[in-house]
């Protein structure tokens, strides 16, 4: 089998997913930092954007991430009850249940949005989470918007 035939037979092998992670500064970002300083291996194709709290993340940023070329989006913050701002993660949990319905309405498969809790001490969990999401998004294939002209290149 020639190389082009092999690539056509295994299209998912050539796909390197682009993932945007919208994370809490106090917990998940610190967990990502711990994963890095501990030299834990995780997929390099994630772009981390940190926020003071997941409760402060505007749902439109998820749509903007997909419009900007993301194949998957992770929203991650402090475990329930551990929020630096007392109730921000509870607010986020309620909000993201609604965002999933918004994604379905706009034609985006809600399985491309991931929500997780990662504390500052869970570097291994962060690395495993990123690897798991990367594998799932790779299996799902690249995100194809309804209007491809609106998708900007990933830079």
Which residue ranges define each predicted feature?
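Iron-sulfur-associated redox domains of electron-transfer enzymes in respiratory
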Residues: 1-155
